[in-house]
């Protein structure tokens, strides 16, 4: 059984909430490089997040790291701000 994805803490700029997900090699080997996944495809691979997260980029030097974002309506007081 593959190990589970690792989820970063959330971080923010003035428009988006961000996080990255580090996939175990068993899962990352199933994803073609330079492909952005839909929310449904992410769930089928075992990536579990609340609704609205967009897979907007892959970390080129480390393709097992997927970058996600979603719009926010305000930044919580206890989080990192870019």
Swiss-Prot record:
Keyword Transport in record: no
Lineage: Eukaryota, Amoebozoa, Evosea, Eumycetozoa, Dictyostelia
Entries under InterPro entries matching the protein: Cyclin-dep_kinase_reg-sub (IPR000789), Cyclin-dep_kinase_reg-sub_sf (IPR036858)
Cellular component annotations (GO), alphabetically ordered: cyclin-dependent protein kinase holoenzyme complex; SCF ubiquitin ligase complex
Coiled coil regions, renumbered to chain: none
A single MF term (Gene Ontology): ubiquitin binding
The protein's name: Cyclin-dependent kinases regulatory subunit
Source taxon at top rank: Eukaryota
Keywords: Cell cycle, Cell division
GO biological-process terms attached to the record: cell division; regulation of mitotic cell cycle
């Amino acid at each position: 059984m593959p190990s589970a994805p690792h989820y970063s803490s959330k971080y923010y700029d003035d428009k988006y909430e961000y996080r990255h997900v580090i996939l175990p090699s068993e899962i990352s080997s199933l994803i073609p490089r330079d492909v952005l996944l839909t929310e449904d495809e992410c769930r089928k691979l075992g990536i579990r997040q609340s609704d609205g997260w967009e897979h907007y980029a892959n970390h080129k030097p480390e393709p097992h790291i997927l970058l996600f974002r979603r719009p926010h309506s305000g930044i919580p007081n206890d989080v990192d701000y870019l």
